[in-house]
């Protein structure tokens, strides 16, 4: 089997995508951000999906148990690996690769199954932006530090909260209408807007906290 043959193109592309995401995540961490957290923040509409086949599919893929970016990388990685292995098996048996019109759907099917079971195994070991030490509702009334560049009403940025157990949580915070948060601001979380977004105000006790 020739790894870089044309019949392996879609699978090599998928593996390259995983490597690219890894590089982008490293770059984002160097800049003080979390690419996975940013993606999850833009998936608030998942919270409104409570019934139907879409909800079942998302649950099967462990969306919610794992960060969305991790699920995406698992999908791409397994698809690339399974596709290459299937084509290799075909060459070993029939001395010729099969058409990707057949191999791609089969690879997708095995990929979905692999992601489901792998996700269930690794989910307890994946660090999330929240912890079981306190619930998300308990963030309200806590002080946080703005770590993103800038936030305005409707356009949140990342903030860092350290709970009473010393654990760090990264949240998306935004100010009230007409206010602006900038990097380094200390803010008070006052209410929850969605699964990942919170409303905050500037530190009302700057002389104390």
Swiss-Prot record:
Keywords in alphabetical order: Cell inner membrane, Cell membrane, Membrane, Transmembrane, Transmembrane helix
Specify the domain of life of the species encoding this protein.
Bacteria
Name of the encoding gene: yqiJ
Spell out which residues lie on the membrane's Periplasmic side. Answer: 1-11, 87-101
Q: Per its record, how is this protein called by name?
A: Inner membrane protein YqiJ
Q: Pfam families of this UniProt entry?
A: YqiJ_N (PF21001), YqiJ_OB (PF07290)
Task: Give me any GO biological process, just one.
Answer: DNA damage response
Q: How does it sit in the membrane?
A: Multi-pass membrane protein
Any idea where this protein resides? Answer: Cell inner membrane
Does the keyword Transmembrane belong to this entry? yes
Quick one: where is this thing mainly located? Answer: membrane
Q: Where would you find the membrane-spanning parts of this chain?
A: 12-32, 66-86, 102-122
**Disulfide pattern:** none
Q: Which residues lie on this side of the membrane: Cytoplasmic?
A: 33-65, 123-209
Q: Which GO terms describe its cellular component?
A: plasma membrane
């Amino acid at each position: 089997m020739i790894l870089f043959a044309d019949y392996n193109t879609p699978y090599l592309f998928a593996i390259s995508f995983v490597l690219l995401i890894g590089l982008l995540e490293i770059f984002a961490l160097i800049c003080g951000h979390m690419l996975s957290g940013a993606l999850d923040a833009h998936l608030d509409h998942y919270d409104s999906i409570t019934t139907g086949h879409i909800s079942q599919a998302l649950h099967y893929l462990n969306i919610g148990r794992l960060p969305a970016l991790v699920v995406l990388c698992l999908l791409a990685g397994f698809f690339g690996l399974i596709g290459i292995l299937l084509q290799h098996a075909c060459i070993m048996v029939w001395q010729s690769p099969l058409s990707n019109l057949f191999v791609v759907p089969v690879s997708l099917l095995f990929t979905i199954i692999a992601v489901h079971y792998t996700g269930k195994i690794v989910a307890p070991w994946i660090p999330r932006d929240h912890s079981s030490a306190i619930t998300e509702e308990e963030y309200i009334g806590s002080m946080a530090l703005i770590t993103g560049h800038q936030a305005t009403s409707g356009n949140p940025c990342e903030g860092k909260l350290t709970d009473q157990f010393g654990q760090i949580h990264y949240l998306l915070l935004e100010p009230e209408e007409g206010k602006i948060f900038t990097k380094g601001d200390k803010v008070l979380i006052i209410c929850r807007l969605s699964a990942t977004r919170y409303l905050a105000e500037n530190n009302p006790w700057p002389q104390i906290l």
